[in-house]
């Protein structure tokens, strides 16, 4: 949902801004983390941090976009279900960890995907997206001070810790 729009930019505006920078965006979720990255020219590092901060801190969590994502996830579930290696790994994790989060499918329970709503995403965001739980990394010929300033400027709205127990 990160690239589906923010409170200040539509998904089209986000895509155009990335294209104008020549940015390469990627996102990946695993059992223990979610990673968002923008690969840009060194002169655009602060701008990239600004975009990532906007996507993480100001995500619009639009219900129409959520429905599109749920359709995509359902299709991925079906595709993965037909891949024996993926199914075997999911089953191995479930049987090893059962009720622990590590035992749950990365993309969620395929029978429950359709029940997820915007409120679920907001609760997940509140519980997991906070200062102590986020790492921002910049590599290459970038100004450390500019990156630190950009992080402080663009991620300041997140609480330092979570209030969710």
Predicted regions and their residues:
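Active-site SXXK
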Residues: 1-6
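Charge-rich, well-structured scaffold segments of protease-associated domains
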Residues: 13-164
């Amino acid at each position: 949902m990160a690239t589906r729009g923010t409170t200040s930019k539509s998904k089209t505006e986000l895509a155009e801004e990335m294209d104008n920078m020549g940015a390469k965006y990627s996102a990946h979720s695993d059992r223990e983390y979610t990673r968002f990255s923008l690969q840009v020219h060194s002169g655009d590092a602060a701008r990239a941090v600004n975009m990532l901060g906007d996507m993480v801190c100001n995500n619009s969590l639009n219900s129409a976009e959520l429905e599109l994502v749920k359709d995509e996830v359902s299709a991925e579930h079906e595709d993965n279900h037909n891949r024996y290696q993926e199914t075997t790994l999911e089953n191995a994790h479930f049987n090893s960890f059962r009720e622990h989060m590590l035992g749950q499918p990365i993309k969620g329970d395929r029978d429950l995907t359709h029940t997820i709503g915007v409120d679920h995403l907001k609760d997940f965001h509140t519980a997991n997206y906070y200062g102590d739980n986020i790492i921002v990394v910049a590599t290459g010929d970038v100004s450390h001070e500019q990156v630190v300033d950009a992080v402080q400027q663009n991620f300041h709205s997140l609480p330092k810790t979570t209030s969710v127990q």
